[in-house]
Amino acid sequence: MKRIFILLLALVLSVQVITATKNQEEFNLNYDQQKEIVHFVENQIIESYSNYYTIPTINVEIESVNVRDNQLIIDLKANITKVLKVNSALELPYVKGMLEEISNIRDKYDFDRAKRYAENLIKDLNYNYIGVEQNENADFQMQIPIIAERSNLYNTRCNLLFKDENNDTLTMEEFAPLSEEMLEKDGKRYINNIIEHQKYSIRSSSPGNYDRIIARDYVRKWSDACGECHCSDCDPSKLVYNPSYANYHNNDCANFVSQAIHEAGVPTDDKWRPGNRCWYNTGHEGDGLIDYMVEEGLFFETNDRYKAFAGSIIKWTEASHVGMVDQNDTVTMTFCAHTDDRNSCAFRTIRGLTFFVPVWDSYSKQWTPQ
């Protein structure tokens, strides 16, 4: 059925596009075509998530339609509500892998440490994710070749791609979460990492003040979805920004994350406060938010996405940009940010990304294994 839909769509649209471009007319999809494309994309997203999530609601909108490189390029935005299918965190593949690895630990001290970490993660997952609707926004692109002759129809290949946040485009197979086997392996690997490399960074009295769940809720409230006003050049008056803080418009990412951290309990000082460089600068080239948080012993750096629970900072290593993780259920992750504005935005690859995780987990009331 999917193949038949693609062939018919490619044929119909190709004839229309060729005619429109020859006449130098703007090409528009009619209502029925838009409806079919949206329905197709929605089904592909639901199928990609079917192993782990039910999808109570999904809304896909066509953002733009262009002819480029002999293809019809359709950019789409999706808002997805997803709920984990499992009834307990114990049923998640990542947790299963952790518990299996813990059962093999013979040293009592190591066993107790690993077990304590697993119990706290399970508590977090059961309360914040199991049975809870998670909102997610994602960008997609459909590429339909323009076919000049009907004889070439069966050689055509229409692509639906996920537009990742580090400027990658991924196939729907790559967009889909990892297999259960891979997630179990990652759970085992993480327990080994805790046992072999665990250390704590306790250099400040402030880590215990940071409530990462409050920070999570703050960034969700004061960021816009991947919609009308998600870009840096839109009307600032339409953006969802907290009026209690200054708005740096086209360079507001660090200012936004600083707000969340402060609202979540970390006190300001002479160096890190609104208006100072450490507050509104990322630290990509030194002397910024990231530098301050690490030097003060509040956050530590890791490239392990499983450590980056909600309330962690996400940083782009090749750009001066930061955001905050707002969801990590061990299957998928989302983040919120300003400039460009993102709200519970999906991402898959972590190439070019690093995470800064609170050294104190306010939710489980324990120091975070590094």
Kindly give the residue locations of the regions a language model identified.
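Positively charged n-region of N-terminal signal peptides that target proteins for export
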Residues: 1-4
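Sec-dependent signal peptide cleavage junction
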Residues: 14-28
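A short hydrophobic beta-strand element
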Residues: 70-82
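Short, cysteine-centered beta-strand-loop-beta hairpins and adjacent loop/turn segments enriched
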Residues: 80-97, 130
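Non-catalytic propeptide/linker segments at domain boundaries
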Residues: 108-214
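N-terminal capping segments
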Residues: 192-278
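...with weaker cross-activation on analogous glycine-rich loops/strands in unrelated enzymes
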Residues: 276-342
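Low-complexity, Gly/Ser/Thr/Pro-rich intrinsically disordered linker/tail segments
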Residues: 334, 348-370
